[in-house]
């Protein structure tokens, strides 16, 4: 069956020592007085169940996951029979709509052309009681693959190929002007196994904690300027993989996504030094004070220069993606890894088919050097010549999408999730299936009243 990898975590990953520290895994799971809200939320989502139609062509097929504020379904396009994922959330979502934020991030990332390592946003809609989005249906995420196939850790040849792809995916996000801020194994997934064009591609997903780190430069068309770093930020992300700066409450930059990538790869390959520690402050001190050789002792030594490099960067600096990839490439060469070799979970038939598409399309991740040198943002210093008052309305130019995307061409929150109130949702009509089952409400949810400007 199809597995949705931008699934809803049902348990919190963050420390219980402080209610102000939130992981992205709270985006549906964490509710205020859930006992009092359950019934209301269920009413908000009652239309969204197998058999219901969206836009008169997407039919809900099966439930893939659910949490306190929303559900995820597999949906099928009844015109071309393609499958996708539906994520629907109650408007009672604490901290505001995660779907609005994800919509904004995905539109920015894909505005200059489809990016292979990022799910496509196919459609979004805002209703009176719920918001929903239809996105690319992916395969299993890296966390689930480890649990099923490699409980003692990924074999090095597979692990290093995953490492390179994850770096490419993160840089794609950075090149769009966004930070992900919740890098972890559950937020990366291989493509849908039924789609040979995507099956071997690792995708980055779940942008509910993302943040724009640049603004349009009003003095130069097509250029950007950095947002001024805030003096303090609340904890967000997932404590196991959060960067050292996050434990200090410091503003995050591109380097912090790479720190989280290092910790994520450490977790996939072996284990984290703080695996059995549940004290957030103690974990932060370990990340900040351990020498690189000690911190990276379970990883190939070729990767030690990565953390040494990261410690030299401030919040505005651009990471040296080429240096990082060179470290990965040394491991790739040392252990004679190959992009041609099948993955353990691929059948022989699927491996042959997927390889043919991989070689035919010349996937960028097999030779990422030129891409990693590109720097469309061109920011490596702080905004000394700009006033911090200019940062009140962050924007990076993007084409506003209000229509569905052809399927042939996918989503986490905190107490202070970046404001989504000005981000528009899709405007296409939501039309229920004619002659639908009695279990599906006969009347579709009504549109909310649009606020006056």
What are these regions (language model features)?
Residues 8, 20, 24-53, 61:
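Juxta-kinase regulatory segment immediately upstream of eukaryotic protein kinase catalytic domains
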Residues 162-163:
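Activation segment signature within eukaryotic-like protein kinase domains
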Residues 71:
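Conserved N-lobe ATP-binding subsite of Hanks-type protein kinase domains
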Residues 77-101:
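ATP-binding glycine-rich loop module of kinase domains
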Residues 174-192, 196:
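Catalytic-loop of the protein kinase fold
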